[in-house]
Amino acid sequence: MELIFLSIALAMDSVAISMANGARCMNIKALQIFKMSFLFGIFQAFMPVIGYFLGLAFVGFISYIDHYVAFAILLFLGIKMIKESRQISVHCSLNLSLRMLMLGAFATSLDALAVGITFSFEEINIAIAAFVIGLVCFVLCVIASYMGRVLGEMLESKALVLGGVILILIGCKIIITHLIN
């Protein structure tokens, strides 16, 4: 049960981006939602595995910079979304480019990398943990994308601004949490 709650917590940043993407592109197709959610799920699943195998060797270095990298990427994506709010269209080609999605997936999965490092100190089946984390993230992102699409229809261009603000706030939360700890 603890793994499920951990998986939900790790997925929240990806869920926020999925909801924002659904809101900013009201004609997002089921296949796009699947691809985006799958990519977020894959990153959330593999980052703990990478962290697990990095273990103690690089713990000081990784824990020192991961927050700054995540903040910078989320700030960039958030500002970009806010700028794009002036150009919103119902027939959105949506910068759901692989590059942009991978940046978002990477930034939101850095905390999963850190969790993977902590897994290396515990007796845990990393394969099962990674599968559960990835699956939970995937399912929640699919749901959030559809919810975002409904919100996008109601809010129109304001949804893109809201999505950008959410990304910036997530980045700020990451950096503040790092500075407090």
Swiss-Prot record:
Keywords: Cell inner membrane, Cell membrane, Ion transport, Manganese, Membrane, Transmembrane, Transmembrane helix, Transport. Signal peptide: none annotated. It comes from Campylobacter fetus subsp. fetus (strain 82-40). The gene is mntP. Belongs to the MntP (TC 9.B.29) family. Probably functions as a manganese efflux pump. The keyword Transport applies. The chain crosses the membrane at residues 3-23, 42-62, 63-83, 101-121, 124-144, 160-180. Pfam families: Mntp. It is a multi-pass membrane protein. The keyword Cytoplasm does not apply. This is Putative manganese efflux pump MntP. PANTHER family: MANGANESE EFFLUX PUMP MNTP-RELATED (PTHR35529:SF1). GO terms for molecular function: manganese ion transmembrane transporter activity. GO terms for cellular component: plasma membrane. It comes from the Bacteria. InterPro entries: Mntp/YtaF, Put_MntP.
